[in-house]
Every structure is written in structure tokens, then in C-alpha cells.
Amino acid sequence: MNNNHWLERTELLIKQQGLDTLQKAHILIVGLGGVGSFAAEFIARAGVGSLTIVDGDCVSLSNINRQLPALHSTVGKNKTEVMAARLLDINPQLNLTVIHEFLTPERATEIVTPKFDYVIDCIDSITPKLNLILSAKRQRVRLVSCMGAGGATDVSQIKVADLMKTYNCPLAKFIRKRLKNERIDSGIKAVFSSEIVSKDSMQRTEGLDYKKSFYGTISFMPAAFGLHAAATAINYLLKRPATP
């Protein structure tokens, strides 16, 4: 396997054809918090050849309980910078594009193009999330959108389903409503939890970064969401019919 010897266990499972498929793929991940950072890690370790990561945030002390780039030694650093170093240490041959910015409606339209084989949405605020979903839908690029991982602790209730069939998730409820206003009522995969959210863990904010509130979060729930998102993308790529 030459320089890809580190993927020998993966090759045993998906064979050389599977490795070649993933090597040729280009995935876009937007949001590198608790969900997106783990999704990026799993994508890189699977041997995906090209990856674009987008986030405009810096590591803060409150991120340490759940986010992969967050350590006491990385507080204040750009999440994209920390994750880029980590991903390239996993796979030095990774074709990595780093975009250090928050996703505006205009940039969502510019960034999401048919060159991507899959988009993983790990944004945790409504307006940018909606813009990313709409951009992927308009460009006909496959997407999985991660809903709220906060306020829950039962990983067995994490599911992947059509967004319009999600339930018990406050974030998904808002996104469903907004998408229906855009006349979109199917065709978007979502990672969500069916667990009833712990409302007493919610805290209001000043509306910074499009957020009006957030829920308390345990270490493993965002990572589990990222795992489901990465698996959804990778399994789709491996099962997709080969193009001539």
C-alpha cells in the first residue's frame, strides 16, 4: 500500500476499490465545534483525499468539555488552525483547504459548488445553517445536517433520518419551518436525537453569532453526532455507483 500503509485495516474492510473511491472524494465540513471537529477527524482517518473545513471561531475555555481542538494550550487559537495541523498529522497527503470565516449567505453561495461530493453541516445557529442547506440543495450536492446535540445524554437515541421526519429537537423544528417557507419538504438527511431536551439546561445569550440560546452539553454527545454524520457521508460515497 506504499504511503497508505496506515490504511491497511481500512483496506481489509472496504478493499482497494473503496480506498480509491474515498481518495478521489472531496468533502466540505462547515463548523468545527464539538460535532464538526470529530466529523473531520473521522473523515480524515477514513482516507478521504480532499477536505475543506470552514469555521471563523477561536478556541475558548468553555469548549474544552466537548471539542476536539480545545485544550488549555490552544485557547485563543483559531479552530481551523488547530484542526488543520491535526488532520495533516493524521494524513500528510490530505488535500486540505482551510477557510477561517463564519459562513454568511453570500459566502455559502460561493463556497458550495458541485466540486464537492458531500457536505457535512455542523453549524449550531439557525440562519447560517439554513443558508448552507439551501446552497447545497440548489447546487444539488448531497448534504447531512446535524441538529442539536445539547440538552441530551442518551446516545442510543441519536438517529439519521429525513429532516422533515425529525422530532423532539428544538433546532430541527425551526429549520423545518424555515425550509417549508422555501418550499422544501424532503430530501435532506439529518442527524438528530429523539431524546426530550432538558429545558432547565438552556441558557439565553445576547444573540451573538446568530445565537439566542444554547443548551448544556456533555462530552460525548457532540462527538457521537459527528460520528453519525461522517458515517453517513462515507457510506454514501462507498455505495454510490461509480461514474465513467
Segments from the language model and where they lie:
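Conserved N-terminal Rossmann-fold NAD(P)-binding element of oxidoreductases
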Residues: 29-31, 54
